[in-house]
Amino acid sequence: MFDGKSILITGGTGSFGHKYTETLLARYKPKRLIIYSRDELKQFEMQQKFHAPCMRYFIGDVRDKERMHRAMQGVDFVIHAAAMKQVPAAEYNPTECIRTNIDGAENVINAAIDNNVEKVIALSTDKAANPVNLYGATKLASDKLFVAANNIVGAGASRFSVVRYGNVVGSRGSVEIG
């Protein structure tokens, strides 16, 4: 499925992106695997770990529509894992949470449509099912944007889907242990 394809992972330096990169490289031979993240230190650390010639690192933020558009040129698949997911930070910085989780989702969708990306898979959370905080509410809105994008493209090239999952042990999520 991913052999010979170009794949972009937004939030690629996060817990999911890091593990997914490991899995992709072990199972497939992608033409390009682009890690899109605003964290240059984590990108540097990933460069030290993953030496596959297909790896590319793109400093960028999903809130920047022009940068997002450029990063998706020639991409076949997008895994959208970028999010502001720390619940207390989202509550204290609501505008930044909305800009990242909702506006960022819209930027991913528009860039994918404009670049004829074959498939976009957006990661979501169980907190979007019955939101009780801003993080859950923004992820619910994001989910709806991705699903509705299929109506916008109609029979067009791009397809969009959302995968919701719960808290993952060992991730840098918002669950406090102890």
Where are these predicted regions, by residue range?
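Conserved Rossmann-fold NAD(P)-dependent oxidoreductase catalytic core, especially the SDR/UDP-sugar
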Residues: 77-80, 84-153, 158-166
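Conserved Rossmann-fold cofactor-binding substructure of NAD(P)-dependent oxidoreductases
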Residues: 56-77
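Adenine-nucleotide cofactor-binding loop residues
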Residues: 41, 63, 85
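N-terminal Rossmann NAD(P)H-binding glycine-rich loop of SDR-like oxidoreductase domains
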Residues: 5-27
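Conserved glycine-rich Rossmann-like NAD(P)H-binding loop of the short-chain dehydrogenase/reductase
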Residues: 25-42
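Conserved residues in the N-terminal Rossmann fold of short-chain dehydrogenase/reductase
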Residues: 37, 58-59, 99
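Short, conserved SAM-binding/catalytic segment
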Residues: 46-55
